[in-house]
A protein has these predicted regions:
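Short hydrophobic alpha-helices and adjacent helix-cap/hinge residues
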Residues: 1-183
Length: 183
């Protein structure tokens, strides 16, 4: 691309987080839910994801979006906010690794979220929390990115072949046991 002429871009991955599709899924399963909270962390990915969601929901009627923002919240305050959320709201998981104090969360943090509000419908727009916390979501399929990235790098290093951009497809994923327990 002409706007990147001073960079040597030879390939990369393009992902799309489909907010509309996730809200559609939630509305299908929970038709009375119109209020949501998006959880994002204090990282570039978290800030970017929050900006995407803000942009997407700005023109939507009948949707109220709250933000649990890792730039201003600690892990403890995030848990406190989630504890107080009513079950007629849904929590959207975006990213959560780093809080406002640059503290990193650990792998079992999703269980703590669940323990704080076990009746809260939780959905993932990025794939996090699909280990017993999120009911489901529509998000990019990251499962084979490492292998594909290695192939792209090796093709460039060995043969100087630019690979272009690889589009990561999205898919719906659900935790069947959690869906049963919520319906």
């Amino acid at each position: 691309r002409s706007d990147f002429h001073d960079f040597n871009i030879v390939g990369g991955f393009l992902t799309y987080f489909d907010i509309d599709k996730n809200l559609q899924i939630i509305h299908t399963l929970y038709p009375n839910i119109t209020e949501f909270s998006l959880l994002t962390d204090n990282s570039l990915g978290g800030v970017t994801m929050q900006a995407l969601v803000r942009d997407k929901v700005a023109g939507m009627k009948g949707i109220k979006m709250n933000y649990i923002d890792g730039r201003t919240e600690t892990y403890a305050s995030m848990l406190q906010i989630i504890r107080k959320m009513p079950s007629d709201m849904a929590l959207l998981l975006g990213t959560w690794r780093v809080d406002c104090n640059d503290n990193f969360s650990i792998g079992n943090s999703s269980m703590q979220v669940n323990e704080n509000n076990p009746t809260l419908p939780v959905f993932s727009i990025s794939g996090i929390g699909m280990n017993g916390l999120a009911i489901g979501g529509y998000y990019p399929d990251f499962r084979h990115d490492g292998e594909r990235l290695a192939e792209i790098c090796m093709a460039y290093l060995e043969r100087f072949e630019p690979q272009g951009f690889v589009y990561v497809s999205n898919s719906s994923n659900f935790d069947y046991q959690l869906m049963e327990s919520f319906n």
